[in-house]
Amino acid sequence: MSSNQSVPVEEVIKHLRNWNFSWNIILTILLVVLQYGHYKYSRVLYGLKMAILWLLWPLVLALSIFDAWASFNVNWVFFAFSILMACVTAVLWIMYFVNSIRLWRRTHSWWSYNPETDSILSVSVLGRHVCLPILGAPTGVTLTLLNGTLLVEGYQVATGVQVNNLPGYVTVAKASTTIVYQRVGRSMNANSSTGWAFFVKSKHGDYYAAANPTEVVTDSEKILHLV
C-alpha cells in the first residue's frame, strides 16, 4: 500500500521565489548585455556578448546530442528532433567558420569572426587600414571630415586628416565578393579641414579589400577564390 505525499505550498512558493529571483538577475544581465553590448558603448559588455554568442553553438550542440542519447529507444519523436537540431546547429556552426575565414582572407580584420558581422567596410587613410563592421553593403558611403577628424559612417577613425589625405575609393567586403566604391563627389574647406566625400558602387569582384593610395584597383590586388 502506497501513500501519497504532498509538497507543502509554503515550500513550493519558497522554491519558486528563489528561482524567480535567480532568473530575474540572469535575464536582467542578459538584457543589458544584448542591448548595450556594442563596441561603441562598452568593450567589456561587447566582449561578454561575443562570448555568449560563441558559447551558444557548442552548448546547443552538446544539449542536442545529450537529448538524442537520452531519448534513444525511449521516445523516437524526441530522438528525431534532437538529431535534427544537432544537424542544424552543426551546419550553422560550420557556415559561420567558413564565411568568417573567407571574410578574413579579404580584409585581415578580426571583425571577420564577429557572428553579427555580415560585411566589413575598409578605408585607408594616413597609412592606416581601418575596418568597420556593417550589416550589409550600402548603396553609398559617406566620409565626413570635421576639423581634421575623419568620420566613416558616423564613427571616428582618424585625426589630423587633411583634405588631400582622403582616399579615392573605399571597399566593402562580403564573404562572397568585394565591392569597390568610387568617389563621385565631395565638398571641402581646405582651410578648416572640414567637408564630406561621397562614394558609390563602382565594381565588384574577387579583390583584396585593403585600399591602396591610388584610385584604381589593379589586377594584382585580386585574390584567389577559396577552395
From Swiss-Prot:
Region spans: Interaction with N protein: 201-217
Parts forming coiled coils: none
Family annotation (Pfam families): CoV_M
Subcellular location: Virion membrane; Host Golgi apparatus membrane
Keyword check for Protein biosynthesis: no
Chain ranges on the Intravirion side, renumbered to this chain: 34-42, 98-227
Virion surface compartment residues: 1-12, 64-76
GO molecular function: structural constituent of virion
Keyword annotations from UniProtKB, A to Z: Glycoprotein, Host Golgi apparatus, Host membrane, Membrane, Transmembrane, Transmembrane helix, Viral envelope protein, Viral matrix protein, Virion
One GO CC term, this protein: host cell Golgi membrane
Top-level taxon of the source organism: Viruses
Primary localization: virion
Membrane disposition: Multi-pass membrane protein
Transmembrane residue ranges: 13-33, 43-63, 77-97
Family: Belongs to the alphacoronaviruses M protein family.
Quaternary structure (record): Homomultimer. Interacts with envelope E protein in the budding compartment of the host cell, which is located between endoplasmic reticulum and the Golgi complex. Forms a complex with HE and S proteins. Interacts with nucleocapsid N protein. This interaction probably participates in RNA packaging into the virus.
Miscellaneous remark of the record: Bat coronavirus 512/2005 is highly similar to porcine epidemic diarrhea virus (PEDV).
General function of this protein: Component of the viral envelope that plays a central role in virus morphogenesis and assembly via its interactions with other viral proteins.
Protein name (Swiss-Prot/TrEMBL): Membrane protein
Organism per entry: Bat coronavirus 512/2005 (BtCoV)
Gene name of the record: M
